[in-house]
Amino acid sequence: MGRVRDCTGSGPLVAYQFLTVKASGLVTGRAASCQALKLDNNSIWDYIRFNRKEKMKIKEALKITDSFTKTSKMPGLSYSLPAWECKTGWKLAQVPGTPCFSCYAKKGNYTRYPAIKAAQYRRLKAIEHPDWVQAMAAVIKRQKFFRWHDAGDVQSKEHMEKILEVCRLTPDTKHWLPTQERQFLPDPEQVPDNLVIRLSRSKIDGKASSAWAHESGVTEGTARTCPAPDQKGQCLDCRKCWDKDVQVVIYGKH
């Protein structure tokens, strides 16, 4: 058991166990005292509890989070919420020329099977559960790659902070979060190294923006950079969406 003081030397001491975190901003040894500032005290204790013997089992976690999605396209699990509850996306869905106007998450299997929509609303409600962060991390930590919201989007600043916590607790998983919710974007320095948040362009063939470091867009032309349509709809060995060195990913219109 060790102790961490903030970098000013005047802050509270926080007890911690031996930590090995590659992507969360915490490191082992002496350097931990300053880098621990990337997590508040609650986050540190969350990490400790998560890695102790009493960590949540998958079966218990799924009772809180509800089910995840495993598609043949993706290299790992994904997670969906109801597209009807998108804050910005629902407004854009009324506007021709936006990706949300013909949103794939409001047609096909998403609407064909009532059980899918019901599960999405259960997941939406689950975000309020006090153990949601721990439960999500318990399931996701076994994944090399994870996609947030193959349907739906971030609901609030509090929801975004919870997502950041999940990413910090799963440093060996690469996370990809596409979003239209500009008002919920965190400060860039708060984003863990293992998370890529891609701000979605609001118009098809829309212009690039300097509002955020990573973007995604939709095209009806030849500017597509996502190879999935040429690979029977699969990612195969492509990981552009999860790669922080790739600033922009352009998809073909669904």
Functional labels for PLM-detected ranges:
Residues 12, 17, 30-33, 48:
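Short, low-complexity, intrinsically disordered N-terminal modules
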Residues 3-5, 30, 49-52:
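Basic polycationic patches enriched in arginine
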Residues 40-41, 46-48:
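Short, positively charged and aromatic/hydrophobic N-terminal segments
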Residues 18, 39:
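Cationic, low-complexity basic patches in intrinsically disordered or flexible, solvent-exposed regions
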Residues 20, 26-29:
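Intrinsic disorder/low-complexity segments
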